[in-house]
């Protein structure tokens, strides 16, 4: 019902070499426009957060049912794409994000600028549950596990270029009964407080 979390370790500051060969530099219009690829990244201030992106209206099933579909409406800062501020000249934003993923040793690629956290602007996912025995109060939500970091890119004789990356490692959805204990996910507990009846087990402090 929800995505598989990945635990990723990494030091606060590290250098990733993108190419074993010499950096390739091309003169542009002056030193400030000098293009250089194959440089190194020094990463710092890596931060992770879990963010609620979509939430279903409170779900109340008076009679037992075999399946249920919940429309998730976007909440908070959604419809966003990964961003890179301060992209080095001659380097794509996707390459910077890929370098961050290499530094973090992620199992799956980080989201790149072509990805978005909801299907379309203003529209959410539809979550379907088919357990065969649904009754009572439920809650459903979607989340993203965001990651952001500062970097300094050094290449050839160019001055270091400093920038900032914001992307995400994972997105997922959940559907749980309000009568169960609190969700393992912070966003699940937040969703339960928004959707479940007061006093439900799912809203208790974990």
Describe the function of each predicted region.
Residues 26-76, 114-206:
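Core pore-forming/fusogenic effector modules of secreted, proteolytically activated toxins
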Residues 1-28:
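Secretory targeting and sorting signals
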Residues 70-123:
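Membrane-inserting effector segments that mediate pore formation, membrane fusion
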Residues 14-23, 95-107, 142-146:
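Hydrophobic alpha-helical membrane segments, chiefly transmembrane helices and signal peptide h-regions
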Residues 4, 8-9, 62-66, 75, ...:
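Small/flexible residues
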